[in-house]
């Protein structure tokens, strides 16, 4: 069955692309020919993240259906300034965004960017240009409270500290698709 429903994996790919765009837009990637490593983003389950010095990881937490009326953004017209009310239902997903940085004593200086700094930068991105970019793909973001950044010591030997903040997004799905799935899963039982 073909649907426009964004699966968790599809949403994750869009979030990874969005964060990569943040790194490019905010010039957090090293200049061409530089030996310095830039920030990278990948899914939480990838084992290769231990090889990176500066990394952002995405960890899916939960999803909730928040209602049959939501907002659909004008992605078809490439218009991200208006949202049209439609009878879609919204799935509200919560992702944890982890920022990690390998710290060596020789690295620390006045201009050293910590994992807390990167978490603050990404929150600003998701509350601004990043939200606009996600709207182009039909994903709405909820404002992030900056007080929700949690910083703790990482148990691994590679990273001494980790900053984590929750990212809540809303993903619409056509109600007709949802109703057909309900009837598939529960034959003979129909929603009122």
PLM region spans:
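Acidic-leaning, charged glycine-interspersed low-complexity segments
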Residues: 117, 124-177
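Ordered, soluble secondary-structure elements with a strong preference for glycine-centered loop motifs
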Residues: 5, 9, 112, 116, ...
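Short, cationic low-complexity segments
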Residues: 81-87, 181-192
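Generic recognition of flexible, low-complexity loop/linker segments
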Residues: 44-45, 84, 153-154
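Small/polar-rich, solvent-exposed N-terminal microdomains that initiate assembly or binding
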Residues: 1-81, 191-192
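Intrinsically disordered, low-complexity coil segments
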Residues: 25-39, 101-118
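Short, charged, solvent-exposed linker or helix-capping segments at domain edges/interfaces
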Residues: 68-71, 176-184
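Oligomerization/assembly interface segments of phage tail-like spikes and tubes
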Residues: 86-112, 120-122, 160-172
